[in-house]
């Protein structure tokens, strides 16, 4: 696979993480660039690891994973999205302590993993072509880090306009990303 094709693949793999990051950025209260970059690194790291895992699986059991990957991603993103919508419709918007937990490491990692399942499937397919999986994974991780950082900051602008409804927007965004992944595989 040539370098241009690898770059296109890397940015294609980052699009669903970018969409989720816009939703995440909308619910954060004025995230700083350093916070957006930290979240980008988490997403990028997970997005870089999943093609490696997929590549290893592709060497052994590709048909089992490919049959279910889109359903897993859709389910995880829908559950996370519904929870965000629920939180956004609470009359008090939740306590300040609860708001601080919305971007907890666990929740961030779950969202990142949910949006990276397609990268795992790509890793499975990369097992069958001549590609340096280490370079491909690194490029996917770097592209995702960049796109998520941009998405968080773009979401910040959306969140300041939408106020407490930003969480509903974020939840709907996650559900839409999950539906997009599911639709693309059916």
UniProtKB/Swiss-Prot annotation:
Residue ranges crossing the lipid bilayer per the database entry: 3-23, 39-59, 65-85, 109-129, 133-153, 166-186
Subcellular location: Cell inner membrane
Role of this protein: Probably functions as a manganese efflux pump.
Cellular-component GO terms for this entry: plasma membrane
InterPro entries the record matches: Mntp/YtaF, Put_MntP
Protein name listed in UniProt: Putative manganese efflux pump MntP
Membrane topology (UniProt): Multi-pass membrane protein
Upper lineage: Bacteria, Pseudomonadati, Pseudomonadota, Gammaproteobacteria, Oceanospirillales
Taxonomic source organism: Alcanivorax borkumensis (strain ATCC 700651 / DSM 11573 / NCIMB 13689 / SK2)
Gene Ontology terms for molecular function: manganese ion transmembrane transporter activity
Superkingdom, taxonomy of origin: Bacteria
Family matches, as Pfam families: Mntp
Family the UniProt entry places it in: Belongs to the MntP (TC 9.B.29) family.
Alphabetically ordered keywords of this record: Cell inner membrane, Cell membrane, Ion transport, Manganese, Membrane, Transmembrane, Transmembrane helix, Transport
């Amino acid at each position: 696979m040539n370098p241009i094709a690898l770059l296109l693949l890397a940015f294609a793999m980052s699009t669903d993480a970018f969409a989720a990051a816009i939703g995440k950025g909308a619910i954060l209260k004025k995230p700083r660039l350093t916070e957006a970059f930290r979240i980008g690194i988490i997403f990028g790291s997970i997005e870089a690891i999943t093609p490696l895992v997929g590549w290893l699986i592709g060497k052994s059991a590709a048909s089992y994973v490919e049959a279910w990957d889109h359903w897993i991603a859709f389910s995880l993103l829908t559950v996370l999205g519904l929870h965000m919508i629920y939180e956004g419709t609470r009359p008090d918007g939740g306590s300040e302590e609860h708001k601080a937990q919305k971007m907890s490491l666990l929740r961030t990692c779950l969202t990142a993993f949910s949006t990276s399942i397609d990268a795992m499937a790509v890793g499975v397919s990369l097992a069958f072509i001549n590609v340096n999986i280490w370079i491909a994974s690194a490029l996917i991780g770097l592209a995702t880090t960049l796109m998520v950082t941009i998405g968080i900051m773009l979401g910040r602008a959306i969140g300041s306009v939408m106020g407490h409804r930003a969480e509903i927007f974020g939840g709907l965004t996650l559900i839409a990303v999950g539906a997009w992944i599911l639709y693309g595989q059916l």
